[in-house]
C-alpha cells in the first residue's frame, strides 16, 4: 500500500472504532503498545494490558487466569510463536472492528473497551482474548 492509501485505511479503521466501540484515541495507542510488547516478548507488559479474570486454554483445558503474575508465568503457553507473529505483524489499517472489539488476524487476539462506570464514560482498553485463530 502506498502511504496515502495506508493513511486512508487507518482512518477508516479509526472511524469504525468510533462508530462501534468509542474514542479511537484510546484504542490506537493500546493496540500499538500491545503489538510492541508482544514483539519484544515482554510478558509483564502484555500481562498489564489484559483484563482479568482472563480465559485461556492451557494444555487443552479452559483455565481462568486471575492476575498479571499468573498470566506472565503462563505467557509462552498463551502467546505461542504463531500467535505472537500474527499480533506483531498486524497492519493497523487491516484490523477488523466489531461489537466484540478489535480483532487481530483471524481472531488470534482481541482488544476491547471495558466500562468502569454505569454510564460507560470511563473505559479501559484491554486485551480480552488471545487464542488460536479461526484459520488454525
Where are these regions (language model features)?
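C-terminal-biased regions
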Residues: 4-36, 47-136
Amino acid at each position: 500500500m502506498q502511504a496515502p492509501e495506508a493513511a486512508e485505511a487507518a482512518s477508516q479503521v479509526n472511524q469504525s472504532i468510533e462508530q462501534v466501540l468509542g474514542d479511537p484515541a484510546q484504542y490506537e495507542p493500546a493496540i500499538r503498545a500491545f503489538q510492541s510488547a508482544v514483539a519484544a516478548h515482554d510478558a509483564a507488559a502484555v500481562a498489564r494490558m489484559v483484563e482479568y479474570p482472563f480465559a485461556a486454554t492451557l494444555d487443552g483445558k479452559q483455565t481462568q487466569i486471575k492476575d498479571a503474575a499468573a498470566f506472565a508465568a503462563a505467557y509462552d503457553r498463551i502467546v505461542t510463536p504463531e500467535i505472537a507473529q500474527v499480533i506483531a505483524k498486524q497492519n493497523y489499517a487491516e484490523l477488523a472492528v466489531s461489537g466484540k472489539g478489535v480483532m487481530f488476524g483471524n481472531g488470534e487476539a482481541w482488544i476491547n473497551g471495558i466500562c468502569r462506570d454505569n454510564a460507560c464514560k470511563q473505559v479501559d482498553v484491554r486485551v480480552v482474548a488471545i487464542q488460536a485463530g479461526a484459520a488454525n
